[in-house]
């Protein structure tokens, strides 16, 4: 959005004198704080999907609420580098904000990955209730505070599915596959139990890896599969709906703390408000992605009901098994599972 600066031109000496007197009556620091424009570069790995849609509505909201004092520019589709580079840029200040699935922040704090525990949520509605839980928000948005980050947003994008070059119609078809996963031990352990070799990879690298045969498939959401033209390399998506893909919005802490207090409040307020506003959009985008996938010639596959249940039984202990390796991780896992139960009970 374009920032328009107002210019005042003194047409006569008398008018200039009045203006100069008024300006001198205002403390210099206050005038500077009001007039300064703060550039906010926002990075995200997706395009025309839930994370970048959140970035867009957040950017518009903070520009409006700040009266143009914050100029927010969104860089979707990993324009500012791979996911690890986007995270580093946000930590160290070359980028002011990143909107990225929480598991990829695991290098900052391993507790970011707890959202990837299989079976945590059964639906997007439950996932959206989970992200609104005060205990969950307090935990997730506090992570990384000692590593240069300030959390402002948390929401569920969609469930995970698996795209593959050959169809995965049964649990047995997972065995021996090399699949890209997110950067989470919860995911690598889960798919390992299904006989998969997990390969952690940034989203922008997945399509070339599929085309080159480096991997057999990938875990991601229907949004990226459709919007990033994955059908050029693979046409089969198995709708396992696990785990949920949760996204955090992190701001560079040093940049944030240097802002005037009123602008800090706007960023925090809009981060939370747009985390709620995105929910209906996420549901709509998911529905359209599913329809677009089949309309473009892709196939959406559901495991037989008994095999889906068997898969969930196989994965049921992953969360506890992975989290028990570290007390902090175990505590975070308990906070999320307790909140998930509250969300489930309230539906």
Name every feature range the model reports, one short phrase each:
Residues 1-16, 21-22:
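Twin-arginine (Tat) signal peptide motif
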Residues 2, 34-127, 135-347:
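N-terminal secretory/targeting leader peptides
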Residues 26-33:
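Sec/Tat signal peptide C-region and signal peptidase I cleavage site
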